[in-house]
Amino acid sequence: MLAIAERAWRGGGTEYFDGLGTILPSEDTEAFKEFADFEKRMLWHKEHTFKGYPFAYVKQTNVKWNITDAFPNGGDMDKVFPPEQELKDIYHYNGNTYGVRQAMGAGIYLRHVWGDMVPAFYADPKENHTAYAYTWVYSPKDQEVGLWAEFQNYSRSEMDLAPLPGKWDYKGSRIWINGCEILPPVWTATHKVKSYEVPLGNENCVGRSPLAVHLNKGWNKVFLKLPIGKFKMAETRLVKWMFTTVFVTPDGERAAEGLIYSPDKQK
Protein backbone atom coordinates (compact mmCIF):
# COMPACT_ATOMS: atom_id res chain seq x y z
CA MET A 1 0.00 0.00 0.00
CA LEU A 2 2.78 2.43 0.92
CA ALA A 3 4.76 1.58 -2.21
CA ILE A 4 1.73 2.17 -4.43
CA ALA A 5 0.99 5.43 -2.62
CA GLU A 6 4.56 6.57 -3.19
CA ARG A 7 4.26 6.12 -6.94
CA ALA A 8 0.72 7.51 -7.11
CA TRP A 9 1.59 10.72 -5.28
CA ARG A 10 5.24 11.22 -6.19
CA GLY A 11 5.62 9.45 -9.54
CA GLY A 12 8.89 7.95 -10.74
CA GLY A 13 9.73 4.28 -10.97
CA THR A 14 10.29 4.11 -14.73
CA GLU A 15 13.57 2.28 -14.19
CA TYR A 16 11.67 -0.93 -13.41
CA PHE A 17 11.20 -1.56 -17.12
CA ASP A 18 13.49 1.02 -18.69
CA GLY A 19 16.62 0.92 -16.55
CA LEU A 20 18.00 -1.27 -13.80
CA GLY A 21 14.79 -3.21 -13.27
CA THR A 22 14.89 -5.02 -9.95
CA ILE A 23 18.46 -4.00 -9.10
CA LEU A 24 19.22 -1.06 -6.82
CA PRO A 25 21.48 1.55 -8.46
CA SER A 26 24.84 2.58 -7.03
CA GLU A 27 24.86 4.63 -3.83
CA ASP A 28 25.98 7.86 -5.48
CA THR A 29 22.97 8.10 -7.81
CA GLU A 30 19.82 10.13 -7.30
CA ALA A 31 17.70 7.02 -7.88
CA PHE A 32 19.38 5.27 -4.95
CA LYS A 33 19.03 8.30 -2.71
CA GLU A 34 15.33 8.49 -3.56
CA PHE A 35 14.84 4.81 -2.75
CA ALA A 36 16.78 5.11 0.52
CA ASP A 37 14.59 8.07 1.49
CA PHE A 38 11.44 6.10 0.66
CA GLU A 39 12.73 3.13 2.67
CA LYS A 40 13.40 5.36 5.68
CA ARG A 41 9.89 6.82 5.53
CA MET A 42 8.29 3.41 5.04
CA LEU A 43 10.12 1.98 8.05
CA TRP A 44 8.89 4.94 10.10
CA HIS A 45 5.33 3.96 9.21
CA LYS A 46 6.14 0.36 10.12
CA GLU A 47 7.24 1.44 13.61
CA HIS A 48 4.41 3.93 14.16
CA THR A 49 1.38 3.77 11.85
CA PHE A 50 1.43 -0.03 11.53
CA LYS A 51 2.93 -0.92 14.88
CA GLY A 52 1.70 -4.32 16.03
CA TYR A 53 0.73 -5.45 12.53
CA PRO A 54 2.68 -7.88 10.34
CA PHE A 55 5.05 -5.81 8.19
CA ALA A 56 7.53 -8.01 6.37
CA TYR A 57 10.18 -5.48 5.43
CA VAL A 58 13.51 -4.52 6.97
CA LYS A 59 16.20 -2.09 5.88
CA GLN A 60 18.14 -3.40 2.89
CA THR A 61 19.99 -0.36 1.53
CA ASN A 62 22.95 -1.35 3.72
CA VAL A 63 23.17 -4.97 2.51
CA LYS A 64 25.99 -5.42 0.02
CA TRP A 65 27.04 -8.51 -1.94
CA ASN A 66 29.67 -9.66 -4.36
CA ILE A 67 28.17 -11.86 -7.08
CA THR A 68 30.25 -13.84 -9.53
CA ASP A 69 29.70 -14.25 -13.22
CA ALA A 70 27.77 -17.47 -13.77
CA PHE A 71 29.69 -20.69 -14.51
CA PRO A 72 28.24 -23.20 -17.03
CA ASN A 73 27.22 -26.32 -15.09
CA GLY A 74 26.07 -28.55 -17.94
CA GLY A 75 22.87 -29.33 -16.06
CA ASP A 76 24.71 -30.55 -12.92
CA MET A 77 23.37 -28.45 -10.04
CA ASP A 78 25.93 -29.95 -7.63
CA LYS A 79 28.97 -29.17 -9.75
CA VAL A 80 31.72 -27.40 -7.80
CA PHE A 81 33.39 -24.26 -9.13
CA PRO A 82 36.41 -22.19 -7.96
CA PRO A 83 34.54 -19.80 -5.61
CA GLU A 84 33.82 -22.76 -3.34
CA GLN A 85 37.57 -23.15 -2.79
CA GLU A 86 38.68 -19.51 -2.60
CA LEU A 87 37.13 -16.06 -2.92
CA LYS A 88 38.76 -13.92 -5.61
CA ASP A 89 37.98 -10.88 -7.71
CA ILE A 90 38.69 -12.82 -10.92
CA TYR A 91 38.44 -16.54 -11.63
CA HIS A 92 40.03 -18.51 -14.46
CA TYR A 93 38.17 -21.70 -15.28
CA ASN A 94 38.38 -23.93 -18.34
CA GLY A 95 40.06 -21.23 -20.39
CA ASN A 96 37.54 -18.52 -19.52
CA THR A 97 37.65 -15.57 -17.13
CA TYR A 98 34.85 -14.91 -14.64
CA GLY A 99 34.56 -11.64 -12.78
CA VAL A 100 32.76 -10.40 -9.68
CA ARG A 101 30.34 -7.48 -9.39
CA GLN A 102 28.67 -5.85 -6.42
CA ALA A 103 24.94 -5.76 -5.80
CA MET A 104 22.94 -4.16 -3.03
CA GLY A 105 19.81 -5.36 -1.29
CA ALA A 106 18.44 -8.16 0.85
CA GLY A 107 16.68 -9.69 -2.16
CA ILE A 108 18.42 -10.02 -5.52
CA TYR A 109 16.99 -11.27 -8.80
CA LEU A 110 19.68 -12.82 -11.00
CA ARG A 111 17.05 -13.33 -13.69
CA HIS A 112 13.52 -11.97 -13.53
CA VAL A 113 10.70 -14.41 -14.15
CA TRP A 114 9.57 -12.25 -17.08
CA GLY A 115 12.90 -12.74 -18.80
CA ASP A 116 14.21 -9.85 -20.88
CA MET A 117 11.17 -7.68 -20.14
CA VAL A 118 12.47 -6.70 -16.70
CA PRO A 119 16.23 -6.26 -16.24
CA ALA A 120 17.90 -8.14 -13.39
CA PHE A 121 21.50 -8.71 -12.24
CA TYR A 122 22.60 -10.64 -15.33
CA ALA A 123 22.05 -8.85 -18.62
CA ASP A 124 21.90 -12.10 -20.60
CA PRO A 125 21.28 -15.02 -18.22
CA LYS A 126 21.57 -18.55 -19.55
CA GLU A 127 20.11 -21.86 -18.45
CA ASN A 128 22.33 -24.46 -16.76
CA HIS A 129 24.66 -22.07 -14.94
CA THR A 130 25.82 -21.62 -11.34
CA ALA A 131 26.40 -18.28 -9.63
CA TYR A 132 27.85 -17.48 -6.23
CA ALA A 133 27.08 -14.58 -3.90
CA TYR A 134 28.94 -13.71 -0.75
CA THR A 135 29.43 -11.01 1.83
CA TRP A 136 31.00 -10.51 5.22
CA VAL A 137 28.82 -9.39 8.11
CA TYR A 138 30.39 -7.58 11.05
CA SER A 139 28.71 -8.16 14.39
CA PRO A 140 29.70 -6.02 17.39
CA LYS A 141 29.18 -9.01 19.70
CA ASP A 142 28.52 -12.73 19.84
CA GLN A 143 24.79 -13.02 19.39
CA GLU A 144 21.86 -15.13 18.30
CA VAL A 145 19.91 -13.57 15.46
CA GLY A 146 17.20 -14.56 13.04
CA LEU A 147 17.81 -15.34 9.38
CA TRP A 148 15.45 -14.63 6.54
CA ALA A 149 16.56 -16.78 3.63
CA GLU A 150 14.81 -18.06 0.53
CA PHE A 151 15.70 -18.91 -3.05
CA GLN A 152 12.26 -19.19 -4.63
CA ASN A 153 9.72 -16.59 -3.60
CA TYR A 154 6.43 -18.40 -4.06
CA SER A 155 3.60 -16.58 -5.80
CA ARG A 156 0.36 -17.19 -3.94
CA SER A 157 -1.61 -17.28 -7.19
CA GLU A 158 0.27 -20.40 -8.34
CA MET A 159 -0.15 -24.05 -7.41
CA ASP A 160 3.58 -24.71 -7.07
CA LEU A 161 4.97 -27.55 -5.01
CA ALA A 162 6.94 -26.89 -1.84
CA PRO A 163 10.62 -27.92 -1.89
CA LEU A 164 11.57 -31.46 -1.00
CA PRO A 165 12.58 -32.13 2.64
CA GLY A 166 16.08 -30.83 3.35
CA LYS A 167 16.21 -28.75 0.17
CA TRP A 168 15.79 -25.01 -0.24
CA ASP A 169 14.30 -25.28 -3.71
CA TYR A 170 14.32 -27.40 -6.88
CA LYS A 171 17.45 -25.66 -8.20
CA GLY A 172 19.98 -26.85 -5.63
CA SER A 173 20.56 -23.52 -3.83
CA ARG A 174 22.64 -23.66 -0.64
CA ILE A 175 23.84 -21.26 2.06
CA TRP A 176 26.75 -21.34 4.50
CA ILE A 177 27.51 -19.06 7.45
CA ASN A 178 31.11 -19.22 8.65
CA GLY A 179 31.55 -22.45 6.73
CA CYS A 180 28.57 -24.20 8.34
CA GLU A 181 25.75 -25.07 5.98
CA ILE A 182 22.34 -23.74 6.97
CA LEU A 183 19.59 -26.21 6.22
CA PRO A 184 16.05 -25.13 5.36
CA PRO A 185 13.16 -25.39 7.80
CA VAL A 186 10.77 -28.31 7.81
CA TRP A 187 8.28 -27.49 5.09
CA THR A 188 4.67 -27.60 6.23
CA ALA A 189 3.30 -28.31 2.75
CA THR A 190 4.08 -31.89 1.74
CA HIS A 191 1.62 -32.56 -1.09
CA LYS A 192 3.07 -33.94 -4.32
CA VAL A 193 0.17 -33.19 -6.68
CA LYS A 194 -0.32 -29.58 -7.72
CA SER A 195 -3.72 -28.11 -6.94
CA TYR A 196 -5.20 -24.65 -6.55
CA GLU A 197 -7.17 -26.02 -3.60
CA VAL A 198 -4.07 -26.83 -1.51
CA PRO A 199 -2.63 -23.73 0.18
CA LEU A 200 1.06 -23.13 0.44
CA GLY A 201 2.63 -23.25 3.87
CA ASN A 202 5.89 -21.74 5.09
CA GLU A 203 7.79 -21.65 1.80
CA ASN A 204 8.36 -17.88 1.84
CA CYS A 205 10.76 -16.63 4.50
CA VAL A 206 8.42 -13.90 5.76
CA GLY A 207 5.66 -16.46 6.24
CA ARG A 208 7.53 -18.36 8.94
CA SER A 209 9.65 -17.71 12.01
CA PRO A 210 13.23 -16.73 11.18
CA LEU A 211 15.86 -19.44 11.38
CA ALA A 212 17.96 -19.09 14.53
CA VAL A 213 21.65 -18.61 13.72
CA HIS A 214 24.73 -17.50 15.65
CA LEU A 215 26.97 -14.61 14.66
CA ASN A 216 30.47 -14.36 16.09
CA LYS A 217 31.87 -11.08 17.31
CA GLY A 218 33.71 -9.64 14.33
CA TRP A 219 33.39 -10.66 10.69
CA ASN A 220 31.11 -13.52 9.64
CA LYS A 221 31.24 -15.07 6.17
CA VAL A 222 27.94 -15.57 4.32
CA PHE A 223 28.27 -17.67 1.16
CA LEU A 224 25.52 -18.67 -1.28
CA LYS A 225 25.56 -21.22 -4.10
CA LEU A 226 22.95 -20.38 -6.72
CA PRO A 227 22.56 -22.92 -9.52
CA ILE A 228 19.94 -22.79 -12.24
CA GLY A 229 18.86 -25.52 -14.63
CA LYS A 230 16.08 -24.86 -17.09
CA PHE A 231 14.03 -21.71 -16.86
CA LYS A 232 10.93 -23.92 -16.86
CA MET A 233 10.24 -26.83 -14.54
CA ALA A 234 7.30 -28.98 -13.55
CA GLU A 235 7.34 -28.21 -9.82
CA THR A 236 7.17 -24.40 -10.02
CA ARG A 237 5.65 -22.56 -12.96
CA LEU A 238 7.67 -19.39 -12.42
CA VAL A 239 11.32 -20.33 -11.96
CA LYS A 240 12.91 -17.52 -9.99
CA TRP A 241 16.70 -17.32 -10.08
CA MET A 242 17.03 -15.18 -6.99
CA PHE A 243 17.90 -15.07 -3.33
CA THR A 244 16.82 -13.31 -0.17
CA THR A 245 19.25 -13.28 2.73
CA VAL A 246 19.26 -10.85 5.66
CA PHE A 247 19.66 -11.04 9.43
CA VAL A 248 16.75 -9.97 11.62
CA THR A 249 15.83 -10.03 15.27
CA PRO A 250 14.88 -13.51 16.54
CA ASP A 251 11.19 -12.59 16.34
CA GLY A 252 11.57 -11.23 12.80
CA GLU A 253 10.18 -7.82 13.73
CA ARG A 254 13.22 -5.72 12.80
CA ALA A 255 16.62 -5.89 11.16
CA ALA A 256 19.34 -7.14 13.50
CA GLU A 257 21.01 -4.02 14.88
CA GLY A 258 24.62 -2.96 14.57
CA LEU A 259 25.53 -5.19 11.63
CA ILE A 260 27.73 -4.14 8.72
CA TYR A 261 27.37 -5.99 5.41
CA SER A 262 30.56 -5.63 3.39
CA PRO A 263 32.01 -8.08 0.83
CA ASP A 264 35.34 -6.26 1.29
CA LYS A 265 35.27 -6.15 5.10
CA GLN A 266 35.00 -2.37 5.13
CA LYS A 267 33.45 -0.87 8.27
In which residue ranges do the predicted regions lie?
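Flexible, acidic glycine-rich loops studded with aromatic residues
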Residues: L2-Q60
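Generic structural detector for well-ordered beta-strands
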Residues: N66, W136-Y138, A212-H214
